[in-house]
A protein has these predicted regions:
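A general marker of short, structured functional hotspots
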Residues: 23, 31-34, 57-59, 166
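Generic detector of low-complexity/intrinsically disordered segments
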Residues: 8, 18-19, 32-33, 39, ...
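Short polybasic linear motifs
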Residues: 1, 6-18, 23, 29-30, ...
Length: 361
C-alpha cells in the first residue's frame, strides 16, 4: 500500500513538473516573440525609409495624445505595462486591475504656447476582480483675438478653443495572470463656431508572464470612425464654408514590456520598453525607468526615439526628447496621497511641467 501511495505521489509530482516546464516554455516563447518584434521592427527601419512623417496632420483630436499624469510622462510614457493606479484609465484600462484600492487623481500641465491641460479620474472596485472608473480630459486656452490680413493686431473680437473627453472604464481580472479593460469616451473639439464630436474606444490587456515580475501589455487607443467638423467658418476670401473634409481619430497601437531587475525590501527598480504605432506619425520606441525607495520616494526617467534613431544624443525627428521626474507618497491617516512631478523637454518648442495628485480612499 505504501509503495502504491509513493508511486501515485511520484506520478503527481512528475505531472506538476511537466506542467511547470510547459508553462515556462510558453512564457519564454512569448518573451522571445516580444523581443523579436522589437528587433525585427528596428532592423527593418534601417532598410525601409521612414514614411511616418508623411502621415502627420491626417487625424483629429490631437489632444488625446497628450500624456495624462506626471508619473507616466516622467517615464517617457513607456507605462502601458507598468501602470497600477487610476491613471491606467488613460494609459491602459486593464491596468486598473493592478490597483489595490479605490483612487481619485487630478493632473495639471502647463502645455506649450499658454495652453493648459487637465486630467481627472476616479476608480471604484465592484469586487476583487471587477473595477470601474470615470475620467475627464480638458485642453483649453484663454480667449484668443481674431486677426485678419488688414487687422493683424486684432479686430477686437475673440474666439474660444477647447477640447474635452469624458470616459467610462471597465476592467476585469480574468485570471491571476491576465486582465483586460476598455474605455468608452465622448470627445468634443471646439474652435470658434466649429465643433467636432465622436465616440471613441480604448482596449487594453495586461499579462503577467510568470517569469519573475515580467509582464507585457497590448493597447489600442482612440479607435473609432472618421469625423468631420460641424458649423461654419469664413475663409480667406470672405466666403462662409459649411462643408468640411473628414478626418480619422488618432488611433494608436502600443506594445509594452516591463520588469524589475532589482527588488529588495526598501529598493525597487522598474524598467520598461514600449513600441508605439500611431496612424498619423512615425513609429517610435519609449524607454522608461522608475526607482522606488521604501515605497515612499520615487525617481523617474524616460526617453523617446523614432524607429531608426540612436538612443544617445538629441532626437532628430521628434519634438519630444527627454523626460524625468520625482514623486512622494504621503500617509494621511486613513488615506494616502501621491504627489508627482514631471519635466518634459520638447527641444525647440520648449519645456512642459506637469504635477499630479492622487488620493487613495
Amino acid at each position: 500500500m505504501t509503495n502504491k501511495r509513493m508511486t501515485i505521489g511520484n506520478v503527481q509530482t512528475e505531472a506538476m513538473l511537466k506542467c511547470a516546464r510547459r508553462r515556462t516554455i510558453v512564457h519564454c516563447s512569448l518573451l522571445i516573440a516580444v523581443c523579436s518584434l522589437f528587433i525585427v521592427h528596428c532592423s527593418l527601419s534601417q532598410l525601409v525609409p521612414n514614411l511616418g512623417g508623411q502621415r502627420s496632420g491626417i487625424s483629429s483630436f490631437q489632444f488625446l495624445k497628450i500624456g495624462a499624469d506626471a508619473r507616466g510622462s516622467a517615464m517617457g510614457e513607456a507605462v502601458v505595462a507598468v501602470v497600477n493606479d487610476v491613471s491606467s484609465i488613460y494609459w491602459n484600462p486593464a491596468g486598473l486591475t493592478n490597483s489595490l484600492a479605490d483612487q481619485a487623481m487630478f493632473s495639471h500641465a502647463e502645455w506649450l504656447v499658454d495652453v493648459k491641460h487637465e486630467f481627472a479620474a476616479a476608480s471604484y472596485h465592484l469586487d476583487v476582480n471587477n473595477i470601474v472608473g470615470v475620467s475627464f480630459i480638458s485642453l483649453h486656452t484663454d480667449p484668443m483675438q481674431i486677426t485678419t490680413e488688414y487687422q493683424p493686431t486684432g479686430t477686437g473680437n475673440y474666439f474660444n478653443y477647447g477640447d474635452i473627453a469624458v470616459g467610462a472604464t471597465y476592467a476585469r481580472k480574468m485570471t491571476d495572470q491576465f486582465s483586460f479593460g476598455t474605455t468608452v469616451k465622448y470627445v468634443r473639439e471646439t474652435i470658434a463656431e466649429l465643433h467636432t464630436d465622436a465616440v471613441l474606444v480604448d482596449i487594453g490587456t495586461f499579462y503577467y508572464m510568470g517569469l519573475g515580475s515580467s509582464r507585457f501589455s497590448v493597447v489600442v487607443s482612440n479607435f473609432g470612425s472618421n469625423v468631420k467638423p460641424s458649423g461654419s467658418a469664413v475663409n480667406g476670401k470672405g466666403d462662409v464654408v459649411t462643408s468640411f473634409q473628414d478626418f480619422s481619430p488618432p488611433t494608436m497601437f502600443r506594445l509594452g514590456y516591463a520588469f524589475e531587475p532589482w527588488k529588495e525590501e526598501q529598493h525597487r527598480l522598474t524598467v520598461s520598453v514600449q513600441l508605439n504605432h500611431p496612424n498619423d506619425n512615425a513609429e517610435n520606441v519609449r524607454l522608461g525607468g522608475e526607482y522606488e525607495f521604501n515605497d515612499l520616494f520615487f525617481l523617474r526617467l524616460g526617453v523617446k526615439r523614432t524607429i531608426g534613431e540612436s538612443l544617445l544624443g538629441k532626437a532628430a525627428s521628434t519634438a519630444e526628447d527627454l523626460s524625468f521626474g520625482a514623486g512622494v507618497k504621503v500617509p494621511l491617516g486613513l488615506t494616502i496621497a501621491n504627489v508627482d512631478y514631471a519635466f518634459t523637454n520638447f527641444n525647440e518648442l520648449g519645456i512642459v511641467h506637469r504635477i499630479s495628485l492622487a488620493v487613495t480612499y
